[in-house]
Amino acid sequence: LDQLVQNKTDPPNNENRIEFKEKNLGKKIRDLFPSLIQPWKPVTNPAFIFLTLLFLLHIVFFPKTTRIEGWSVFTGMIHNVNLVFHEAGHILFGFFGNDTLAIFGGSLNQLLIPFVIFLSFYYNRDRAGTAFALMWFFGNFIDVSIYMADGRFLTLPLIGGLDMEAHDWRNLFNRFDLWSFVQALSKTIFYLGWVGIFLTE
């Protein structure tokens, strides 16, 4: 009798066992993150207009190549905001005591901050906020890719008028001898940024 009861309660085969485990995993995730099963908040008309305008500004004014000599007014404003998080990244990751991580931390933090904000909006099921954070996140791919490409040409001005010895990506490419991959790496990051922006819209 005990065996019959066990056979009725246990999944009868491997396929059912897998399905059983997947359902349990899904239940555990829902229990840990109950907000993820909530419906998305609707996008208000002002938010929709703002996001559409922001997307169009990206299309018109954001760089179409990794080689630029300066920023437009719009991209300059965005870049200056990103620059705050970039410089903060050097300080933050510098606490780990690793020189390479401290150098890389500037560009890394540019991506981490909008990604964390994206996770927050996503967790709260805020559709407009999620779209905004993703556009900011992928826009930083473009910003970082331009800085990467400039590691070879050194035409962009550095903060505080620092010389080329302070160029993050010049130092990183030197350190890992990646000069033959500069163009491929920077263009890959650049196009990932643009694809992400289009998919966000």
Language model feature labels by segment:
Residues L1-T9:
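Cys/His-rich metal-coordination motifs, chiefly Zn-binding "fingers/knuckles"
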Residues N7, V84, L178-V182:
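A generic structural micro-environment signature
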Residues P12-N24, T75-N82:
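Short, charged cytosolic
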Residues F20-K21, G26, R30-R67, N98-E201:
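Metalloprotease/metallohydrolase-associated module, dominated by Zn2+-dependent proteases
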Residues F62-L83, D99:
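Short pre-active-site segment immediately N-terminal to the catalytic Zn-binding motif
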Residues T75-H79, F95, G129-F132:
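N-terminal hydrophobic alpha-helix used for membrane targeting or insertion
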Residues H79-F95, G106:
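Active-site recognition of the HExxH zinc-binding catalytic motif
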